[in-house]
Design a protein with these regions (language model features):
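Polybasic, low-complexity binding patches
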Residues: 547-555, 567-607
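Short cysteine-rich loop/turn motifs with clustered Cys
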Residues: 508-539, 561-563
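Conserved polymerase palm-domain catalytic core
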Residues: 65, 80, 124-125, 130-133, ...
Length: 607
């Protein structure tokens, strides 16, 4: 299907219209890919109103499942959505709509076809819920606007209950404008939007948070806002068409156009950075910010039917006050002078106060759980949970310029809790068996050990510069995928945290420790196929099985994908042929597979 997705993206870039998308969605290859994608999603274990999860889909015959999805798409009527209230930091709750697992599979089928079309139309500084975009990219873009461009006034706009107030008719018209002209597909999406919410009724507006396709639909709604703001300055046409040179990273140099707009127009210089429904507009002058604030508020109401929250929306002078964005708070401070004698301003980024308090409370909560257990297995799992949490917040917040200072504010309180609750069991000396922890925290004097297991110090963190996405990185072009693989030299931290948080309950501590060490050593890839593994695909295989006298030592374990693991142990010819077809191994990979089969005293595969 990758070739099909690439063609959809290329056609969308050229402005073509798409009138027969349902047939692509119904293709067996697309349905099978959708099944694989939701199977490795942890949310697939959450049941809808029918109480069914991914384990129920796993029981279906492959051809029967494909045929069932195709029939449902012919006359699609969605099941009711289960409503769950998720607590927010402010004490309120956020409604979450969970479709049935079959409806989620159908949404995934649609998402895979719509995403390349929409990606070609989305603005480059829209970062939420998009492939190869992240919160780090959004922070990097915001800091560039503040520090490099010199926009020291920021418009903070909070849309009131955005996901609950999306106009269905307007959304479908926006999809039509993007080139999605398949009326049958639009009617299916309309049915999804109007699906009954169990216990409440049929919604007249809003996109249900929790649906697989909802993030894409929300981006389609706000994409019009992005391009309206961009049209006010960055994409304003000039009388002369300037030839833009291309930088090494693929970004065009628009300095000539910008210089012309600054010198010969009275336009308001502004730049937008958005992550989902959280967006900021950066300006150089307060007078421009005031006018843009009112214009944006009115535009949202007139064009999208959305209101802003007056108490949360404001204009911030970054020289005096902080502006909060994605868990950070940003400000500018003076640092020396420019060659012309003017003060030089640099960004100062801290962790948001509420986020820092939440980190303190969560860390102390896990320490309390460690204190309450004396079972070695449970103790190990809780230490892994604590380490995983601390490493996760370090990884996310390390792009704050003052991250070390911020973590030191809570370090005393967290360490005090650690010593008071575990003081008789803590040791200063020990051996770090986790390779990643050893590389990142091994030089710290604050590392402590509990029954031989290292506990990560909460204040041992260094700032790293946030990186923006390279313009060439693209999931839907061959060149873009090459760039993606270049950036994957390291390991997937999300998978590492998952493995640390979810040790195999029936296995030994040695096994679980070596499982993490091997994942890091193999750079998150399957030892046979070389494919980078998602969390649910990671299997740790005993080269010499325990029943044959094997053990849990590092040398006797290896990380493989779940499908490869099945092939190592399977003696069923039908199963073997099925999964060999899925993997499409070459001779070298097949030799590695056979080597592991022989060690497990299984017959070599000859095909």
């Amino acid at each position: 299907m990758q070739l099909v997705f690439d063609e959809l993206y290329a056609a969308s870039v050229k402005g073509q219209r798409f009138c027969n998308l349902v047939e692509l969605i119904k293709r067996p290859e697309n349905i099978k890919l959708a099944y694989r994608n939701i199977r490795k999603n942890s949310g697939s274990r959450t049941a809808g109103v029918d109480n069914k999860t991914i384990s129920d889909l796993n029981k279906w015959n492959e051809n029967a499942l494909v045929a069932h999805v195709q029939r449902k798409l012919d006359w699609y009527v969605p099941n009711a959505v289960r409503r769950v209230e998720i607590p927010k930091d402010n004490g309120k709750t956020r409604p979450l709509g969970i479709p049935t697992i079959m409806d989620r599979l159908i949404q995934q089928c649609i998402l895979q076809v719509l995403e390349p079309i929409c990606e070609a139309k989305f603005f480059k500084r829209s970062n939420g819920f998009r492939p190869n975009h992240s919160a780090e990219n959004a922070i990097a873009q915001a800091e560039r606007m503040i520090q490099n461009v010199g926009c020291h006034y920021v418009i903070d706009i909070d849309i009131k209950s955005f996901f609950d107030n999306v106009n269905h008719g307007k959304l479908l018209k926006q999809m039509w404008t993007l080139g999605i002209r398949d009326k049958k597909l639009l009617s299916i999406i309309s049915a999804m939007l109007k699906a009954e919410v169990a216990g409440i009724g049929f919604p007249e507006k809003g996109t249900p948070q929790g649906g697989i396709i909802s993030p894409l639909l929300s981006n389609i709604v706000l994409n019009e806002l992005d391009w309206w703001i961009v049209s006010q300055w960055e994409e304003m046409p000039t009388q002369r068409n300037y030839v833009h040179r291309i930088y090494a990273n693929g970004t065009p140099d628009k300095s000539s156009t910008i210089r012309t707009l600054r010198n010969y127009t009275n336009l308001k210089e502004c730049y937008v950075v958005r992550y989902a429904d959280d967006f900021k507009i950066f300006c150089k002058k307060r007078s421009d910010a005031v006018k843009l604030f009112e214009a944006t508020k009115q535009w949202l109401l007139d064009r999208l039917g959305l209101e802003i929250s007056p108490e949360k929306s404001k204009i911030v002078n970054l020289k005096r006050h902080y502006s909060e964005f994605l868990g950070f708070k940003l400000k500018v401070r003076t640092k020396g002078k420019k060659p012309d004698g003017q003060p030089r301003y640099v960004v100062e980024a801290h962790i948001k106060d509420k986020a820092l308090q939440k980190i303190r409370e969560k860390s102390k909560e896990i320490i309390g759980q460690i204190r309450q257990t004396y079972d070695p297995g449970m103790e190990y799992r809780l230490i892994q949970k604590y380490n995983s949490y601390v490493m996760g917040v370090h990884n996310y917040y390390s792009i704050a310029t003052h991250v070390n200072i911020d973590f030191h504010k809570i370090a005393f309180d967290v360490k005090k809790s650690l010593y008071n609750r575990l003081k008789h069991r803590l040791q200063k000396k020990g051996q770090i068996t986790n390779r990643y922890i050893k590389e990142k925290y091994g030089t710290s004097r604050e590392v402590r050990y509990l029954n031989g297991h290292a506990i990560v110090p909460i204040a041992y963190v260094q700032h790293r510069v946030p990186m923006d996405k390279k313009s060439r990185v693209n999931k839907y072009t061959p060149e873009g995928r090459v760039e993606i693989h270049k950036n994957l030299a390291g390991i997937n931290m999300a998978v590492l945290y998952h493995l640390m948080n979810n040790p195999c309950g029936k296995q030994s501590v040695e096994y679980n420790d070596n499982r993490i060490a091997l994942y890091v050593a193999q750079k998150g890839k399957c030892a046979v196929s070389g494919v980078e593994l998602e969390a649910k695909q990671v299997d740790c295989h005993h080269k010499k099985p325990l029943v044959l006298g094997g053990n849990d030592s590092y040398q006797n374990l290896i990380i493989v994908s779940d499908v490869v693991h099945i092939l190592i142990h399977s003696s069923n010819e039908r199963t073997i042929r099925k999964y060999l077809k899925v993997l499409n191994l070459d001779k070298k990979q097949l030799a590695k597979l056979n080597k592991l089969r022989v060690m497990a005293e299984m017959q070599e595969l000859v095909f």
